[in-house]
UniProtKB/Swiss-Prot annotation:
CDD domains: AdoMet_MTases (cd02440). Its EC number is 2.1.1.-. Its main location: cytoplasm. Belongs to the methyltransferase superfamily. RNA methyltransferase RsmG family. It is found in: Cytoplasm. The keyword Heme does not apply. It comes from Staphylococcus aureus (strain JH9). One of its GO terms (molecular function) is rRNA (guanine-N7-)-methyltransferase activity. S-adenosyl-L-methionine binds at residues 77, 82, 128-129, 146. This is Ribosomal RNA small subunit methyltransferase G.
């Protein structure tokens, strides 16, 4: 059973999966595959691959960052809910908001949350650039993003949402260090400071991951984020 494989992997990190959590992951997988037939949620559909490359990969940041506390998390561009929904299953006290620009994905997430009986979750159909200018600006303890865009771009989308004293947890593949070097200027301009870098391998040689923890030291200047599309077209880079 694939969920038992996940339980064994997590046990190595002193994390015990309850029966309820096991059932939630099984339901998550079933709904992901069902909905993926009518909309593009993921290219990964093999059961074991989903448990490894989506579920385990989403939970792995908790080996290095304490999510087991009552904090508010915003997940930018989470797609089918990664990493925040697996983290919510593991740590039910988290208050989770997902922002995604595609309404179909929001519909899936609403159905998923209902079926998993998740409390304190909200899903918002918006561009991160406009969301970061609104009432939720600088209101979250933690913002997560998983390989949505280059780190210089992600920083402009995510750092404005974090309250001073909070953290940006950026999850990248093995080329993350190059992106970090390029993004240092943007991170500084936006009020952040890189405090931790973690590199780890997924089980079964499924690839290397890098995780950056960026502390929000100062308020983000009001002009950021710039209008939709601009961060991607012209990232904040040192001239």
């Amino acid at each position: 059973m694939t969920v038992e494989w996940l339980a064994e992997q997590l046990k190595e990190h002193n994390i015990e999966l309850t029966e309820t959590q096991k059932q939630q992951f099984q339901t998550y997988y079933r709904l992901l595959v069902e909905w993926n037939e009518k909309m593009n949620l993921t290219s990964i559909t093999d059961e074991h691959d989903v448990y490894l490359k989506h579920f385990y990969d989403s939970i792995a940041p908790s080996f290095y960052f304490d999510f087991n506390q009552p904090i508010s998390i915003c997940d930018v561009g989470a797609g089918a809910g990664f990493p925040s929904i697996p983290l919510k299953i593991m740590f039910p006290q988290l208050k989770v908001t997902i922002v995604d620009s595609l309404n179909k994905r929001i519909q899936f997430l609403n159905h998923l949350a209902s079926e998993l009986q998740l409390q304190d979750v909200s899903f918002i159909h918006d561009r991160a650039e406009t969301f970061g200018k609104g009432v939720y600006r600088e209101s979250y303890d933690v913002v997560t993003a998983r390989a949505v865009a280059r780190l210089s771009v992600l920083s402009e989308l995510c750092l404005p949402l974090i309250k001073k004293g909070g953290q940006f947890v950026a999850l990248k593949s093995s080329k993350g260090e190059e992106e970090l070097e390029e993004a240092k200027f943007a991170i500084s301009v936006l009020g952040g400071n890189v405090t931790e870098t973690h590199t780890f391998k997924l089980p079964e040689d499924a690839g290397e991951r890098q995780m950056f923890i960026i502390d929000k030291k100062r308020q983000t200047p009001k002009k950021y984020p710039r209008k939709p599309g601009t961060p991607n077209k012209t990232p904040l880079l040192e001239k």
